[in-house]
Structure formats: C-alpha cells, structure tokens
C-alpha cells in the first residue's frame, strides 16, 4: 500500500502496548500524535531513535504531542526494550503488520542484496483533527526528533 500523504485522514488503529493495554488512535483525539514506525526492538538504529524520542520527550509533551512507537515485535519484547532504555511512551505491537500496511510503512526492503518485507522506518505527525500533518519516509535517525519537534511547533 502507498504511504499516506499530508492531508489524508490517519487510519484508525487499536494495538496493545508493552503493558498489555489497548491503545487506540481515537484515545488522542484533539492532540498531536507522533506515530513512528521502526523495524525491531533493541537494534542499533531503532535504539538510537527510541532514545532520541526519550531524550526529547518532555519537550515533545510541552509542545502538545503524544509519542507512539510501532513495530512488529511482541508486547514482551517491547516491555524489555522500554525497560532497558527507560522509554516513557507506549510501544505498540503490530505483529500482523496490518497498521504498518495501512500507513504505508510496510514494504520491500533490501539488505546485503537480499530482498524481504518489513517496516521502512517512517514517522507520521497527526494533528488534533486526525489528519496527517507531516510524513517522514525512510527516516534517517540523526536529527530526526529535532525535525519532528520543529514541525509540531509549526502546526
């Protein structure tokens, strides 16, 4: 499925977080949501990205945003990852990758010449009305959270 564009209605979802709690996009109606998709818990790039969101979490909250991370990992894997790095936001389990597909974050990847399906690191900024305000496809981790913060301030 093609990646969502700015102005699109963000697809509804209901996924479990690392504590087993069901989290729905509709829980955050009226709030700005940073929805970031990442490939795998506790891998180098994903850890740097999660820790960058952790380090700027208070600034993101002060700017009025809620951060939600999504990967195909299990709730148990998320709990271990969140605990190890003291991550203060929900990590949602999209084990069947249905939500990742709806957002266009699931697709073909290539590593060492081998092609496979997986999450392409991407972030969606969803405004309080549930519309996509900004999209970052194929995220480069370094400096990304600063870009997200700037975009939140511009909404």
What annotation goes with each model-predicted range?
Residues 1-155:
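Chalcogenol-based redox active-site neighborhoods
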